[in-house]
Amino acid sequence: ACLVGSEMCIRDRQYLNPPSADKMEKEVGDTIYRVGDKVMQIKNNYQLEWERKSRYGVTYDRGNGIFNGDTGVIEDINFFSEQMLVRFEDDRFVYYDFTQLDELELAYAITIHKSQGSEYPAVLIPMFPGPRMLMNRNLLYTAVTRARTCVCMVGLEDCFHEMAANESEQKRYSSLDLRIQEMDNL
């Protein structure tokens, strides 16, 4: 997974999953989904039905719920039924109606923020200047700890040192403390 500069990495998809006459495609807005593309669920959907099948096609498990950050591969695009079949990494198969495709995005590359809670065999981290509030030690730690076996940083060594030295954290103004106080007053 490429964790930063995801727009640039997605453009390079043509090398990872090039178009061909035998691969169905579905255009949604500015995005073209193609059989074989890696995709990510971008919001929780507790109603979405999934099933697991044996290698012989027999369903042996069913359930509901696909969650933000789940990744998979497009197995089929069917224009007759207006559905796209995605096989998630844990072998859950999900049929998305074409009206639900806004819940997916291409996942050849993802941002560090979207990678939180997930692991990948290898992580490529482009190291280039960015906003100071993002160039901090916590974000660098998050990026590095997403990798199971291999981390490769590409770019400017100064950016690595800047992030490692920057201990600042962006203060969040969520009003959570006020909401908790309101609940205590009930």
Where in the sequence are the language-model features?
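Short, surface-exposed secondary-structure edge patches
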Residues: 27-33, 63-64
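Short, structured beta-strand/loop micro-motifs enriched in basic residues and often containing a Trp
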Residues: 15-25, 52-56, 101-106
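Single conserved hydrophobic/aromatic residue that forms the stacking wall/gate
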Residues: 1-10
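Short coil-to-beta transition motif at edge beta-strands of beta-rich domains
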Residues: 31-58
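A structural micro-motif recognizing beta-strand termini
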Residues: 28, 42-44, 113, 128-129
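A generic structural motif
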Residues: 20-29, 153-158
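Amphipathic, well-packed alpha-helical segments that form the structural scaffold of globular domains
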Residues: 13, 17, 37-40, 44-45, ...
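C-terminal accessory regions
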Residues: 56, 60-64, 68-186
